[in-house]
Amino acid sequence: MTDRDPIHDPAAMREHYRLEGLDETELAAHPMDQFTRWFAQAAQAAAQGVVYEPNAMVVSTADADGRPSSRTVLMKQYDEQGFVFYTNYDSRKARDLAANPYVSLLFPWHPMARQVVVTGLARRTGRDETAAYFRTRPHGSQLGAWASAQSSVIFSRAELDAAYEQLGVRYPEGEQVPVPPNWGGFRIAPQTVEFWQGRWNRLHDRLRYVAEPDGSWRVERLSP
């Protein structure tokens, strides 16, 4: 292609990243504590209109044959046990995780020149935990969980809207919506957590926590 507009040419796109670095001496002992620090800063940046949805993460899975797929979902909880998101258990990602529980998460905080990459194992949350979260969802989102047979082929948008409208009649605002039996959460127990900080001249800082058999974590610096 010789007529490519330079403005839209990915090879010509350049960004000079921030000067501040990330040093081993600044890290928390546990990766989830370090994540808490960075997530708080990302949330503050979101409040200032700099970052959009700091809890958005790219979830990458692979099926039993090793075929990968990725999608953006919203993290709804995190603690020392890992990261939690909710989905339809009939979706592609849930089917992948049933066959292959290894998963990767990516938090892309581009305006801050930061990203966090997590690898680990997924397991379903308990039904009590799922129900407790479902009750906090807006009424419309609760109906949406019933209306969408996620990842299935549908004839048209009108089909989806009609299903939603029927559910709205069945469960009007103010009436309790039951938790769909095929809907729930996954908790990702991290095995590695990498904190990436953009630096000048592409000499970025990459510090990765690696889980040890005794429950401790070691930190290693990766070449950019």
Swiss-Prot record:
Substrate binds at residues 14-17, 76, 133, 137, 141, 202-204. Signal peptide: none annotated. Its cofactor is FMN. Binds 1 FMN per subunit. It catalyses: pyridoxamine 5'-phosphate + O2 + H2O = pyridoxal 5'-phosphate + H2O2 + NH4(+); pyridoxine 5'-phosphate + O2 = pyridoxal 5'-phosphate + H2O2. Pathway: Cofactor metabolism; pyridoxal 5'-phosphate salvage; pyridoxal 5'-phosphate from pyridoxamine 5'-phosphate: step 1/1; Cofactor metabolism; pyridoxal 5'-phosphate salvage; pyridoxal 5'-phosphate from pyridoxine 5'-phosphate: step 1/1. Its EC number is 1.4.3.5. One of its GO terms (molecular function) is FMN binding. InterPro entries: Pyridox_Oxase (IPR000659), Pyridox_Oxase_CS (IPR019740), Pyridox_Oxase_N (IPR011576), Pyridoxamine_oxidase_dimer_C (IPR019576), Split_barrel_FMN-bd (IPR012349). FMN binds at residues 71-76, 86-87, 92-93, 115, 150-151, 196, 206. GO terms for biological process: pyridoxine biosynthetic process. Keywords: Flavoprotein, FMN, Oxidoreductase, Pyridoxine biosynthesis. NCBIfam families: pdxH (TIGR00558), PRK05679.1 (NF004231). Catalyzes the oxidation of either pyridoxine 5'-phosphate (PNP) or pyridoxamine 5'-phosphate (PMP) into pyridoxal 5'-phosphate (PLP). Belongs to the pyridoxamine 5'-phosphate oxidase family. Homodimer. This is Pyridoxine/pyridoxamine 5'-phosphate oxidase. It comes from Streptomyces avermitilis (strain ATCC 31267 / DSM 46492 / JCM 5070 / NBRC 14893 / NCIMB 12804 / NRRL 8165 / MA-4680). The lineage of its organism: Bacteria, Bacillati, Actinomycetota, Actinomycetes, Kitasatosporales. The gene is pdxH.
